[in-house]
Design a protein with these regions (language model features):
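PRPP-associated nucleotide enzymes
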Residues: 1-313
Length: 313
């Protein structure tokens, strides 16, 4: 099977990560720019030929609106420039919390995003730790749903923590927590929360042995940090020795940084799918890069190799 030339490009908000992915792959980013108009419109442009190439466009959709539109327009531009195939690499897939109708008269935002990407002409999607696995079914093209456990688990093992337990911050995260517990050979704790409304948690309890344990909370994203910080404080109040968190996507909106820094959390381990704000106190944060994982998968996809063996589930 013929292997077409590969070119890797980045959206403006993911260039920091795309450069690391390209370097790990053994190349440099392709030349592109985004022209900005005075009314707020913008126009992406590839500054080199991509005719007949397999084009990988790296863009996390955070913040959710302009980044998505920029990605869609880059996919469209690549398709119109006669690229052989166009792959959207979305380390963080925004809008993923809208995976179903949870009340009357609301959209299914994640399905709409999938429709838009396919309409733009994308041939494949790569992403990491989707908020809901069923989003893969919204696409009619292949979706490589990768897992950050491949970098979190080795790091946690390197800490050599005694009396370690894995905790889910809510019932929805039980499957992920169970996976980490199996990989690390630890007990599991399930937290249960009652939300008063979006981003507002009411009360919280825990199921499992907490007293005397060093606890690692695992989740796919951290937004306002209300749930994680409340869980950490609750677990410490119930006798935990320490509480850490391993979170793939550090959205960290609103009061998140202040909440984390004033909480019982000893360490917050995140990835670089979304950059941390450098104007904040980051003393509790440890950042692990997903660049090598994505570079490996890009190479395997480009050379038509299987990728299932590198999945950590």
């Amino acid at each position: 099977m013929a292997i077409h030339k590969i070119k890797i490009f980045a959206g403006r908000d993911s260039k920091y990560l795309a450069e690391k992915i390209a370097a790990s792959f053994g190349t440099t980013l392709g030349q592109s720019e985004v022209l900005q108009f005075s009314d707020g419109e913008f126009q992406p442009c590839f500054n080199e030929s991509i005719r007949g190439c397999t084009v990988f466009i790296i863009q996390s959709t955070f913040p959710p609106s302009d980044t998505l539109m920029e990605l869609l327009m880059m996919v469209d531009a690549a398709r119109r420039a006669s690229a052989y195939k166009v792959v959207a690499v979305m380390p963080y897939f925004g809008w993923a919390r809208q995976d179903r109708k949870d009340r009357p008269r609301v959209p299914i935002g994640a399905k709409l995003v999938a429709n838009l990407l396919m309409a733009a002409g994308v041939d494949r999607i790569m992403t990491m730790d989707l908020h809901a696995d069923q989003i893969q079914g919204f696409f009619d093209v292949p979706v490589d749903a990768l897992y950050a456990s491949g970098i979190f688990v080795p790091y946690i093992k390197s800490l050599d923590i005694e009396d370690l337990s894995i905790a889910a911050p809510d019932m929805g995260g039980a499957k992920r927590a169970n996976t980490y517990a199996k990989l690390l050979g630890t007990p599991i704790i399930i937290s249960h929360k009652e939300r008063a409304k979006a981003n507002v948690v009411g009360k919280m309890t825990a199921i499992g042995e907490v007293e005397g344990r060093n606890i690692l909370i695992v989740d796919d994203m951290i937004d306002t940090a209300g749930t994680i910080c409340m869980a950490a404080d609750m677990l410490m109040a119930r006798g935990a020795k320490s509480v850490r968190a391993a979170i793939t996507h550090p959205i960290l909106s609103g009061p998140a940084y202040d909440r984390i820094n004033s909480s019982a959390l000893e360490e917050v381990i995140v990835t670089d799918t979304i950059p941390l704000r450098q104007d904040q106190n980051l003393s509790k944060f440890t950042v692990l890069s997903v660049a090598d994982i994505f570079a490996d998968v890009i190479e395997r996809v480009h050379k038509y190799k299987e990728i299932s063996s590198i999945f950590f589930k």
